[in-house]
Each structure stands twice: as C-alpha cells, then as structure tokens.
Amino acid sequence: MAVYVEDHPLIKHKLGLMRQKDISTKDFRDLASEVAGLLTYEATQDMETEVATIDGWAGPVQVERIKGKKITIVPILRAGLGMMDGVINLIPSAKVSVVGFYRDEKTLQPVQYYVKTASAMDERIALILDPMLATGGTLLATIELLKASGCTRIKGLFLVAAPEGIEKIQKAHPDVDIYVAAIDERLNEVGYILPGLGDAGDKIFGTK
C-alpha cells in the first residue's frame, strides 16, 4: 500500500482555507470539490493510454486515449458526495457507486445501511471518496464490500487523514493506495481528527 500526501501549493492553500472555523457552507463545499479534483489528477497518473487515429481538421491525426479498466467513483454517504463533482468534472464517464454506513453507538462499529454499485465491478477501478479518514472503520468496511463485489483495484481519496486510520488500512489492505491532502496529528478521545476540519458532512450540507 502506498500513501501519497499531495503537497502541491494549491492543495495546501485550499485546505488551509477549509480549516477556518467560520467558513461558509458554499466556500467549504466549493473547496472540497476543487481539492477532490486535484487529488483525482494525482490518483489517475498511472492510467494506461493507447494510440488511436481520428479525423482532425487537417486530416488524420494520432491521439492518445485512456484504455483498460473503467472507473467507478464511490462516495461514502453523506460527506463523500461533497467530493463527487470535482471527480466527475475530470472523469465525466465514470459510473457512480454509493455506499452508506452509520456508527453503532454501542459497538462503535460501522453498520451498512445502503449500497448500490455499478455493474461489472470486476472490470473497474474504484475511487473511494470521503473527506476524512479517521479511525478507518468505515473505509475498511467499504473496501471489503467492494472486494466482495469483484473489484480488485481500489484507491481512496481523502482531504485529511489521521495516522491511526492509515495504519489500520495498511495492515488490513496493503493493496489499496491512499491519496490525501494532509495527514494530521491524531484522533481525539471521541474519534475526531485533530486539527482536522470539524464535521465535514455538516459543513458541506449546511447542517452545522
């Protein structure tokens, strides 16, 4: 498993804006989408291309096109939806697979309440979207769900991550790559990332 911390100046700047306590819903939502797009650019650099000949304005011309497995983006409800547009803007043909989990208050384990995956998952590369990789429990459940559906190439895109969550995924699924704008210091006693972004879902949907 590789962990890619994207240290591009634009990502650093935009993430810094997102950390502001009094940021508006619109600004947080827009920035989440923009950073997701930048992460997508990095996460797709290893995609293979093939040469094709097309009719150009001055006659036949050779161009390169992406080949191989098709992409499905997998936003984790609900906050992952806030990153979806940034990815679709770059990969408009991507199919969308959606998963939803809630946390059992007694066991603190993720419980699946919704799943709808694209067809032919064994032929796709999955890009999981979630603003926060905290304890890693929800991501772990999502990866296992995708693998059970036949998907073998999985990547995760996150705005911020905690070392604890990354370590959990590295141990359980070393074949899954992680792309993140920043790795923060730690989790607090209730599982929030510090310094983090706060509740990303509330900030994206304006329910804070």
Curated annotation (Swiss-Prot):
<keyword id="KW-0021">Allosteric enzyme</keyword>
<comment type="similarity">
    <text>Belongs to the UPRTase family.</text>
</comment>
<dbReference type="InterPro" id="IPR034332">
    <property type="entry name" value="Upp_B"/>
</dbReference>
<dbReference type="GO" id="GO:0004845">
    <property type="term" value="F:uracil phosphoribosyltransferase activity"/>
</dbReference>
<dbReference type="InterPro" id="IPR029057">
    <property type="entry name" value="PRTase-like"/>
</dbReference>
<feature type="binding site">
    <location>
        <begin position="130"/>
        <end position="138"/>
    </location>
    <ligand>
        <name>5-phospho-alpha-D-ribose 1-diphosphate</name>
    </ligand>
</feature>
<feature type="binding site">
    <location>
        <position position="193"/>
    </location>
    <ligand>
        <name>uracil</name>
    </ligand>
</feature>
<keyword id="KW-0547">Nucleotide-binding</keyword>
<keyword id="KW-0328">Glycosyltransferase</keyword>
<keyword id="KW-0342">GTP-binding</keyword>
<keyword id="KW-0460">Magnesium</keyword>
<feature type="binding site">
    <location>
        <begin position="198"/>
        <end position="200"/>
    </location>
    <ligand>
        <name>uracil</name>
    </ligand>
</feature>
<feature type="binding site">
    <location>
        <position position="78"/>
    </location>
    <ligand>
        <name>5-phospho-alpha-D-ribose 1-diphosphate</name>
    </ligand>
</feature>
<dbReference type="GO" id="GO:0006223">
    <property type="term" value="P:uracil salvage"/>
</dbReference>
<feature type="binding site">
    <location>
        <position position="199"/>
    </location>
    <ligand>
        <name>5-phospho-alpha-D-ribose 1-diphosphate</name>
    </ligand>
</feature>
<dbReference type="GO" id="GO:0000287">
    <property type="term" value="F:magnesium ion binding"/>
</dbReference>
<dbReference type="GO" id="GO:0044206">
    <property type="term" value="P:UMP salvage"/>
</dbReference>
<feature type="binding site">
    <location>
        <position position="103"/>
    </location>
    <ligand>
        <name>5-phospho-alpha-D-ribose 1-diphosphate</name>
    </ligand>
</feature>
<dbReference type="InterPro" id="IPR005765">
    <property type="entry name" value="Ura_phspho_trans"/>
</dbReference>
<dbReference type="GO" id="GO:0005525">
    <property type="term" value="F:GTP binding"/>
</dbReference>
<protein>
    <recommendedName>
        <fullName>Uracil phosphoribosyltransferase</fullName>
        <ecNumber>2.4.2.9</ecNumber>
    </recommendedName>
</protein>
<dbReference type="InterPro" id="IPR050054">
    <property type="entry name" value="UPRTase/APRTase"/>
</dbReference>
<comment type="function">
    <text>Catalyzes the conversion of uracil and 5-phospho-alpha-D-ribose 1-diphosphate (PRPP) to UMP and diphosphate.</text>
</comment>
<dbReference type="Pfam" id="PF14681">
    <property type="entry name" value="UPRTase"/>
</dbReference>
<dbReference type="InterPro" id="IPR000836">
    <property type="entry name" value="PRibTrfase_dom"/>
</dbReference>
<comment type="pathway">
    <text>Pyrimidine metabolism; UMP biosynthesis via salvage pathway; UMP from uracil: step 1/1.</text>
</comment>
<keyword id="KW-0808">Transferase</keyword>
